[in-house]
Curated annotation (Swiss-Prot):
Gene: ruvB
Species of the source: Cupriavidus necator (strain ATCC 17699 / DSM 428 / KCTC 22496 / NCIMB 10442 / H16 / Stanier 337)
Catalytic activity, EC: 3.6.4.-
Single GO biological process annotation from the record: DNA recombination
Similarity comment: Belongs to the RuvB family.
Task of the protein: The RuvA-RuvB-RuvC complex processes Holliday junction (HJ) DNA during genetic recombination and DNA repair, while the RuvA-RuvB complex plays an important role in the rescue of blocked DNA replication forks via replication fork reversal (RFR). RuvA specifically binds to HJ cruciform DNA, conferring on it an open structure. The RuvB hexamer acts as an ATP-dependent pump, pulling dsDNA into and through the RuvAB complex. RuvB forms 2 homohexamers on either side of HJ DNA bound by 1 or 2 RuvA tetramers; 4 subunits per hexamer contact DNA at a time.
Principal location listed in the UniProt entry: cytoplasm
Name of this chain's protein: Holliday junction branch migration complex subunit RuvB
Catalytic activity: ATP + H2O = ADP + phosphate + H(+)
Domain notes: Has 3 domains, the large (RuvB-L) and small ATPase (RuvB-S) domains and the C-terminal head (RuvB-H) domain. The head domain binds DNA, while the ATPase domains jointly bind ATP, ADP or are empty depending on the state of the subunit in the translocation cycle. During a single DNA translocation step the structure of each domain remains the same, but their relative positions change.
Record key words, sorted: ATP-binding, Cytoplasm, DNA damage, DNA recombination, DNA repair, DNA-binding, Hydrolase, Nucleotide-binding
Region ranges (Head domain (RuvB-H)): 265-352
Length: 352
């Protein structure tokens, strides 16, 4: 049984990154354990099912797997599922934690045959650690230095066959030598509203919360295509329904709760609207460089590129061009504004 959620709301309720270690623990309780329970990502699921089946039949380690895509789409969940489906242990770490070659060597030498090593944020591995990883991935061997100064010598250690599962939100930051060593590369895409509604319904059952199909769909529509956000919104809507209603999550109850949270009909919060309004009002619809945009809304460049932009671009409200960011006709419509002739947006997209 999952205990009552006692989390405080994060700064952005629609942020795709975990708000705290408590929320991470709560996510684990809702996480599907097997590939058959995993909703969405049909192409990736189909590929992994075949590759894992073949590896199990041959009693071999699965090829190394690279999972990339925006945060909150299930990369960590898939790593856990791979280990469970293969019937092996999972060892989990992240790129920034592996500061020295010895840190990685300690992990690798403790792996059992065919185990899964999951490295989150693998694009943040230091170059010296990455160099140690290359022979481990190709030949299941590592070279370590013993001693110091003139007495130092290199010792080659054999490793058990293993599977590296790397996850990243910034695939472009991976070095070519590292990327080329992954036999399986999969991009996770944003989820549809129907897929998210299925996830919300399943999570509600685990939380012993009452929800009707329209209530689940309303939450799903505003979850920005991201399961992590959908589950977070569900918990907040459940709180609202228990205090303001009879605990049953209907469409009207979900709408009222999400309005209180300042999440609008397409899943935008204050920061999304602030970014789009800056492009529209301060820069005439664009184009505007990302550094100028960051200064205008008081955010870091990385926050705009990694957190705010992906969903706005994917949904067609913002466009990246060689000259900068441009608001699309959909952005004008969302704010009830006329799309002025001769603006950056109308030149690129027209008034349709």
């Amino acid at each position: 049984m999952i205990e009552t959620d006692k989390l405080a709301a994060p700064a952005r309720v629609i942020a795709a990154t975990p708000a705290s270690s408590q929320e991470e623990a709560f996510e684990r309780a809702l996480r599907p354990k097997l590939l058959d329970e995993y909703v969405g990502q049909e192409k990736v699921r189909g590929q992994l099912d075949i590759f894992m089946h073949a590896a199990r039949n041959r009693r071999e380690a699965l090829d190394h797997v690279l999972l990339f895509g925006p945060p909150g789409l299930g990369k960590t969940t898939l790593a856990h599922i791979i280990a469970r489906e293969m019937g092996v242990n999972l060892r989990q770490t992240s790129g920034p934690v592996l500061e020295r070659p010895g840190d990685l060597a300690a992990l690798l030498t403790n792996l059992e045959a065919n185990d899964v090593l999951f490295i989150d944020e693998i694009h943040r591995l230091s170059p010296v650690v990455e160099e140690i990883l290359y022979p481990a991935l190709e030949d299941y061997q590592i070279d370590i230095m013993i001693g110091e100064g003139p007495a130092a010598r290199s010792v080659k250690l054999d490793l058990q066959p293993f599977t590296l599962v790397g996850a990243t939100t910034r695939a472009g930051m991976l070095t070519n030598p590292l990327r080329d060593r992954f036999g399986i590369v999969a991009r996770l895409e944003f989820y549809t509203a129907d897929e998210l509604a299925r996830i919300v319904t399943r999570s509600a059952q685990l939380l012993h919360a009452r929800i009707d199909p329209q209530g689940a769909l309303e939450i799903a529509r505003r979850a920005r295509g991201t399961p992590r956000i959908a589950n977070r919104l569900l918990r907040r809507v459940r709180d609202y329904a228990e205090v303001k209603g009879d605990g049953n999550i209907t469409r009207a109850m979900a709408d009222a709760a999400l309005a209180m949270l300042d999440v609008d009909s397409v899943g935008f919060d204050l920061m999304d609207r602030k970014l789009l309004e800056a492009v529209l009002h301060k820069f005439g619809g664009g184009p505007v460089g990302v550094d100028n945009l960051a200064a205008a809304i008081g955010e870091e460049r990385d926050t705009i590129e990694d957190v705010l932009e992906p969903y706005l671009i994917q949904q067609g409200y913002l466009q990246r061009t060689p000259r900068g960011r441009v608001a699309t006709a959909a952005a004008y419509r969302h704010f009830g504004l006329a799309n002025p002739q001769g603006s950056g947006a109308s030149e690129l997209f027209g008034d349709a």
